[in-house]
């Protein structure tokens, strides 16, 4: 048997999803057959998911804004008192327009949208963007979550280029959560990180990301970092909000007002 590699194939979970699988394969430029693939983009009743293949592989990764972790955080996450809410400047009468330039699976953007912020998301990795698009599409039909994801607009491509060539009104706040090269072991075992790492790699362009964000944002830039990680090379943040495992470095440009 061939060793599991870095290749990616698309597969239908059952015959009725073969047409959708073919459509995604064409769109993503991926094969429907690859016995040596290390990953599979699977299409089924629960939408789109990425499954790492092989005997030690963790479970699938998908975007679900309606049930599970997202639902729990929406109901019990602490509302406007959450650190991320304070970091982006949510306050009484203030719901900034936020650009999440490193969207990933959209968890932080969804939290901010659920608190009333108009969100624009950028995701550079086409597979992750596909998961996000699929999750947003499914969530739109939910009575409770539909209005929240209605505040989330997804863009794909290189966030640095997107920000440098921005058209229209600048976002008030830009939120960055770059991949960090040396997560501690407990975080590394999270299945999402195990799947993400080989597909996405580290964001070694974090200083350029910060520079582009500072040039574009009208009011502030917020950078999420592991708690003990160094600040990104470049201008120093004015202050930080620190939690148990992560912190938010805040780069203000002007005050957000109601």
Curated annotation (Swiss-Prot):
Its EC number is 2.1.1.242. It holds the Pfam family SAM_MT. Belongs to the methyltransferase superfamily. RsmJ family. Specifically methylates the guanosine in position 1516 of 16S rRNA. It is found in: Cytoplasm. The lineage of its organism: Bacteria, Pseudomonadati, Pseudomonadota, Gammaproteobacteria, Pseudomonadales. It comes from the Bacteria. Residues 232-258 are annotated as: Disordered. This is Ribosomal RNA small subunit methyltransferase J. Residues 239-252 have a biased composition (Basic and acidic residues). S-adenosyl-L-methionine binds at residues 123-124, 177. Keywords: Cytoplasm, Methyltransferase, rRNA processing, S-adenosyl-L-methionine, Transferase. Its main location: cytoplasm. It catalyses: guanosine(1516) in 16S rRNA + S-adenosyl-L-methionine = N(2)-methylguanosine(1516) in 16S rRNA + S-adenosyl-L-homocysteine + H(+). It comes from Pseudomonas putida (strain W619). GO terms for molecular function: rRNA (guanine-N2-)-methyltransferase activity.
